[in-house]
Amino acid sequence: MSDTIESILQEERLFDPPTEFSERAYVRSGREYEQLYSRAASNPEKFWGELAEQELHWFKKWDQVLDWQPPFAKWFVGGQLNISHNCLDRHLTTWRRNKAAIIWEGEPGDSRIITYAQLHREVCQFANALKSLGVQKGDRVAIYLPMIPEAAITMLACSRIGAPHSVVFGGFSAEALRDRLVDAEAKLVITADGGFRKDKAIALKQEVDKALEHGAPSVENVIVVQRTKADVTMTAGRDHWWHELQPQQSAHCPAEPIDSEDMLFILYTSGSTGKPKGVVHTTGGYNLYTHMTTKWIFDLKDTDVYWCTADVGWITGHSYIVYGPLSNGATTVMYEGVPRPSNPGCFWDVIERYGVNIFYTAPTAIRAFIRMGEAVPNARDLSSLRLLGTVGEPINPEAWMWYHRVIGGGKCPIVDTWWQTETGGIMLTPLPGAIPTKPGSCTKPFPGIVAEIVDLDGNPVESDQGGFLVIKQPWPSMIRDVYGDTDRFRHTYWEHIQPKEGQYLYFAGDGARRDKDGYFWVMGRVDDVINVSGHRLGTMEIESALVSHPLVAEAAVVGRPDELTGEAIFAFVSLEGNAEPSEELKKDLVKHVTEEIGAIARPAEIRFTDVLPKTRSGKIMRRLLRSLASGQEISGDTSTLEDRTVLDKLREG
């Protein structure tokens, strides 16, 4: 951690919110932020209770704002609401009825603009389609779709009838999909024939077929959206075309009153122990927290066109493409494609075409834009932009400066946000009209979030000292459980730092520091999770995929710094006795991992080795491998290393 602290400590630049922006913002000054933060900290139940009453529609008011039995939280106990109703129905009685809810553009250039009234109709029809196939409240529904409107429609239809959804990123392989279907015990899968990415049609239905062939006995039906028009196999009695099933349904489907603590969705995130974690989020607290963070952090106004470039397969897409913006009655942009050699300026074209005002993307995308050069964005009119955001990983100060100068024209505040799948919503962030920003810092906690930097004993560290980022008090959108594995929930998030006197600390797994001005600087993961392009991938999943190859005896995977993706995957591989290392075998292993997990987990480099550095108890010392992969000197304690000659062999490659 010391290197990271050293380099970031040199950052002294400070950018005040533009006066014109502050004058119109929800929170207009540092003083207002401090008052808001103080009010939330002194009486969180009153703070969140008042906001829940003002901002959301409830079928039945709660009896208790918070029931906190550490580490288990229940918010708005006894209250009933429906997030689909809050995202749709309540807007239909206002002028927003005919406002654009979703502006969608496909990679080939096709597009749709869907109003709130139209979206409500399609969601109701699809909710009835789900019911016609026997989906009931509490049944899990898996969604494996490209970035098309049907992804949002499906999520809202599931939440309308109380069926928790589990969205699986379309880049995951059949094997990874099957693991998630089995763990969630999904009753139904919604997929497409395929999607478009980087000028190629990507097959999805055939991956679902493979996953089901390998065994996911809970799945009874599959609904298929026709996107690429590819030929796909349809299994009679199990598979149904969306375009045949949905339009024949009634557009009348009242939103079910849902208990505040009923499960809204399961979203799988990588862990260091191999099996992906099914993060459970519930309804009321998540609805409120994503609503408020969207409103205040993006300073969202009714006239704004808002675009978050994430995929709905990740938490950012759940919270800040679908639920947060639509609950606020916003116009949210969905784009199927990504910048690619044939169209490096596609993002800037979307901004120019639709007059996007708020743009939220990942540092890895910004690094790619920098490589493409300034001429590409400079050829477009980006003057509609008034706020920029970053998400997924810490952004380095120079990328921040480029983003501010080239994309924001030097006038747009940047909200550099830190949060996780488990937190449900943004935790550390500037409020753009109130908090001066420092390039590379996610600045301060959102009102109601009590964050601290501590050592492993839970003691706060001094200013500018690196430590572990923890959250000290419950918040409405916090993870409720790991699906089917409460022991893992306790161990992963609440027992890294032992509770003292009943004080439980949520362990984020990130290293961080706080400077003399109280600004937080997140320094990256402290566990064995690799952050590639803002996506957290478990080392154990990748290692398991490598070892499943018949010629591989053992594998260890680490991250090494990468200018474009933040971290790249570096694999150390030991082969079976008579297997010979070769460039051909490296290519075969890369292909194998891609098939097992997906292209996102493809190793950037593979190094063959006879042995791996291990402790005397047989644990691989990944810390040493990280140093080797990054070309750094080995430092720190190596006393537990079983065979010291291993390091020399690895250095020689």
Swiss-Prot record:
Single GO MF descriptor: acetate-CoA ligase activity
Keywords per UniProt: Acetylation, ATP-binding, Ligase, Magnesium, Metal-binding, Nucleotide-binding
Keyword presence, Metal-binding: yes
A GO biological-process term: acetyl-CoA biosynthetic process from acetate
Modification after translation: Acetylated. Deacetylation by the SIR2-homolog deacetylase activates the enzyme.
GO cellular component, one term: cytosol
Binding residues for ATP: G392, E393, P394, D416, T417, W418, W419, Q420, T421, D510, R525, R536
EC number(s) reported in the record: 6.2.1.1
Residues modified as N6-acetyllysine: K619
NCBIfam families reported for this sequence: Ac_CoA_lig_AcsA, PRK00174.1
Known role: Catalyzes the conversion of acetate into acetyl-CoA (AcCoA), an essential intermediate at the junction of anabolic and catabolic pathways. AcsA undergoes a two-step reaction. In the first half reaction, AcsA combines acetate with ATP to form acetyl-adenylate (AcAMP) intermediate. In the second half reaction, it can then transfer the acetyl group from AcAMP to the sulfhydryl group of CoA, forming the product AcCoA.
Protein name: Acetyl-coenzyme A synthetase
Annotated source species: Synechocystis sp. (strain ATCC 27184 / PCC 6803 / Kazusa)
